[in-house]
C-alpha cells in the first residue's frame, strides 16, 4: 500500500552559493561515492547476486539539462555500507559525452539540482551547516570557492529573461503576545497539553507520555505530531515576487484563500495559479471538508463530481485575479505555451476518472482535451520552445516519453520507450535536448540523453558497470492473459539464475502494494534476490493497479480480495502448468496491499508451500483506528467502519484465520504508522495458537518504507530473511545457509 502523504506548505528557502569547482582529469571519479571500509571483497563474476551487492547499486535521479543543452546535472545516490546510511551528491556530465564529474562535497548530502534560466548557477538542496536554508548554488563562471549565504537569487517560477521569480508562501506568523510564563514549556512536545485539552498534567515535570486530541497525531515517516498549542488559525499561501539581485521580496496578494502552483508567463507579464473555485477562504473550505468528513457515506453526495479548484491569472505586478475557465474537477501542473497565449494543465474530472491534458486560452474559454479517450494517463507536461508538448506516461508496466497532438485529434506519439521505465524528462531552453533516467529489468538506473524528438539517444553514465559485469541479472518474460470478465492482465515471469532446461524450479509470486501502484519493466532488488536463489519469480498487475487507465485502477473499490485475487491466481495457474515449474514448491509474498493480499490468500488456499507477508493488514476496523490514512478505506470501502461494518468485516483476513495452514513469515516495522504493528501481532498469535509454523521479525527505527528507504543494514537483513524463508520451505535449504 503505497500512500503519499499530503504536501506540506512550501517553506521559504535562503540561497547558498558555492563557486564551480575546476576538476582535473585526475579528479574525475569512476566510483561515484566512497563506500568506506568494507567487509571481505565479493567474488568476481559472472555470478548470482549476493546480499552485499545491494550496497553497490548506484541510483541516478533528478536529471536537469542546462539551458544551453551542454550539460546534465543529476543526483547520484549510493549506500555507504560501513556507516549504515545512504549518501547523495550532485554530478554533472556533458551531453556530448565524457566522464561525469562530482560537483558537490563528498562530506555533505546534496540532491535535486536545477539550473538558473541564464545558466550561471546550478542550485541544489543540501542540509549543510552554516546557512539559513537548504538551497545552495554552484557558480559556473568562477573557479574554487566555499559555500556562502546568498539571498539575492530567489527560488520560484521565472520568465524567460530570468529577471525575477514568483512563488507562494504564507505570510509571517504574528509574534506571540505572551500571557505570562508557560508552565508546560519544559515538557516534551507530545507531552504538552494541546490547546483546548480538558486535562492537564498533575506535575509537568513528572509526565513524559503523549497527550492527543487531534486525529492527525501520527504520520508515517514523521512519527508522532504534537497537537496545536494555540487556537487554530489559517495562513493562506500568498503570491510573492522577488527580483534577481535583490534580497527584498514583494507580497502581491493578501487574501483569505491560498494560491498554489504559481507559474509566470514567458514574457513575465502574467501569473497563473490554482485556487478554490469560488475563492473561498481556507478556513471556510476546511470547515466544509471537516463537516462532510463526519457524515455517513452517501452515494449521491460522495460520488458526485466536484469543482475542487480552478485556474486563475493575475498581472505579475499584482491586481485582481481573473478565472480562466470553470472546469469541473482538479487542475495541476500548469504550464504556459511558448507564446504566452495559452495554458495547459493536467486535469482530472473526478477521482475515479483518468487524468487528461487540457489547453485553454489565457483570456478564457472552454478547455480542450488533447488526449481524448486514450487509455493511459500523463504525468508532468513540458511545452517546449519549439511548440511541441511532451510528457511521460506509464504504459502498463513500462513508461515512455510522448508528444501530444495539439489539435487533440490523434493519439500521442511515442518518442522514447521500449522495455524499460523512464523518469524525470528534462529539456534545454531551446527545447531541442532531452535527458532522462531509465532502468530495465536487467539494468539499474542510468542517465540518457537524446534529441527532444527521441532521436539520437545515447547513454551518458555507467555508474553500475562494474556491478553489471559481476552479477548476472535475471530477465523476465512478459505475458498477458484474460481473467474474470475477459479483462486482460499483464504479467512477467523471471527466470532463476543458472536456469537449466529440463529441470523443475520453485516459484514465488510477488504482489505489489498500493493497491494503485504497479510492477513493470525496471530493475528490482527483491525480484533479483529470489531469482539469484534459484527460483522463478512471478509478478503481475491485477485489476486495481495503476498504468492502465482509471477504470482499471478503481475497478476494485469495495471488492478487494475478489476479482483481484482471481487475477493473481489465474497467473499462478498459468505458470504452475509449465513443465519447468514445481507446482508443489510455490510461495507468495507482498507488502502493504500485497501484505493484505498474502494473508487473504492464506485463508483461501493451501496450494502455497510458504508465504511471507510485509506491512500486513488483517483487520480493517483495527487498521482504520490505528493507521494514518483513514481516507483510503473511506473511499475504497464506501464509508467508515460503522457506515459499512459488514464490508470491513468481510474483507478482513482475521475473520477466516482458522483456515490458514501455510507457514508464514511476518515482517513489520516498529514505527510503521501506515500499516501498524497490531495487524501482524494478532495474525502471529492466531497462527501460533493453531500450530501453524510462523515467525515474526520486527525492525526498529523503521517505518512503512523500510523496503525502499530504510536503514541499509536492516533493508538488506530483510532481503536475507525472505531468501532464507523460501529457501527453507521451497528448496530444503538448512536454516541460516541461504543468507548471503
Question: What are these model-derived regions, one by one?
Answer:
Residues 526, 532, 539-740:
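Active-site-proximal cap/loop segments of hydrolase catalytic domains
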Residues 64, 166, 214-221, 225-227, ...:
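Non-catalytic accessory segments flanking enzyme active sites
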Residues 29-34, 87-88, 170-245, 277-312, ...:
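Predominantly five- to eight-bladed beta-propeller fold
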Residues 78-82, 128-131, 172-175, 278-281, ...:
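Short glycine/acidic-enriched loop and turn motifs that connect beta-strands
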Residues 69-72, 119-122, 165, 271, ...:
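Hydrophobic beta-strand positions that form the internal "hydrophobic ladder"
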Residues 33-59, 83-86, 92-111, 126-127, ...:
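Multi-bladed beta-propeller domains
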Residues 281, 500-505, 510-548:
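Short substrate-entry loop that stabilizes the transition state in hydrolases
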Residues 67-68, 117-118, 160-161, 266-267, ...:
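Residue-level detector of Asp-centered blade-edge/turn motifs that repeat once per structural unit
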